[in-house]
Curated annotation (Swiss-Prot):
GO terms for biological process: DNA damage response; intracellular iron ion homeostasis. GO terms for molecular function: 2-oxoglutarate-dependent dioxygenase activity; iron ion binding; L-ascorbic acid binding. NCBIfam families: PRK05467.1-1 (NF003972), PRK05467.1-3 (NF003974), PRK05467.1-4 (NF003975). It comes from Shigella flexneri. This is PKHD-type hydroxylase YbiX. Its EC number is 1.14.11.-. Its cofactor is Fe(2+); L-ascorbate. Fe cation binds at residues 96, 98, 158.
Length: 225
């Protein structure tokens, strides 16, 4: 399943990131991809050796970790170190699949269950640059407001279409979920959303408590910690 997570960054946060990224050192984006991806990848990424990068990636992690909807949808166990990319002048990233595992500075290795793109450019400021994701439900074309994030299964073929005008800047990362199976994770998310909706309408009651108990028992049964 694909999920739109709005408002991960405020407009003020987005402006801060854009200002900081204007000062960043950008390198060939192929430095962080494997042989297959390098054949179709043509973009730029912030140099991960810089102090500016270290500060900005930490700010992204803080933002997503504090966002309740992101947590409910992803049920994250491990987040990769966020990266930053930039597309301009017809740069693109052809169809590819993300690697199943990635190295992690604290955990050694992590499994990539979900991929996330956090948009940092106003969609009206550039042409093209759509994230295109192919999954079992068809093809999805994504171009979100700055500050919004999209989550999708890392097993999906996806690409970024050429940016023919302006500049598209984003942060991206991978998530190892506590729930490995996409279908089980989706069921838990739907159950959680409905519990929260019922609580907002009716307050706490025995039926809602029973559903909450069901949610946590399923999470306990299915989670890998």
């Amino acid at each position: 399943m694909m999920y739109h997570i709005p408002g991960v960054l405020s407009p003020q946060d987005v402006a801060h990131f854009r200002e900081q990224l204007e000062q960043a050192e950008w390198v060939d984006g192929r430095v962080t991809t494997g042989a297959q991806g390098a054949q179709v990848k043509n973009n730029q990424q912030v140099d991960t050796r810089s102090a500016l990068y270290a500060a900005l990636q930490n700010e992204v992690l803080n933002a997503v970790n504090q966002h309740a909807l992101f947590f409910a949808a992803a049920l994250p166990r491990t987040l990769s170190t966020p990266l930053f990319n930039r597309y301009q002048n017809n740069e693109t990233y052809g169809f590819h699949v993300d690697g199943a595992v990635r190295s992690h500075p604290q955990n050694g290795w992590m499994r990539t269950d979900l991929s996330a793109t956090l948009f940092l450019s106003d969609p009206q400021s550039y042409d093209g640059g759509e994230l295109v994701v192919n999954d079992t439900f068809g093809q999805h074309r994504v171009k979100l407001p700055a500050g919004d994030l999209v989550l999708y299964p890392s097993s999906s073929l996806h690409c970024v279409t050429p940016v023919t005008r302006g500049v598209r800047v984003a942060s991206f990362m991978w998530i190892q979920s506590m729930i490995r199976d996409d279908k089980k994770r989706a069921m838990l998310f739907e159950l959680d959303k409905n519990i929260q909706s019922l609580k907002s309408r009716y307050g706490e009651n025995e039926e809602i408590l029973s559903l909450l108990n069901l949610y946590h028992n399923l999470l306990r049964e299915w989670s890998e910690i």
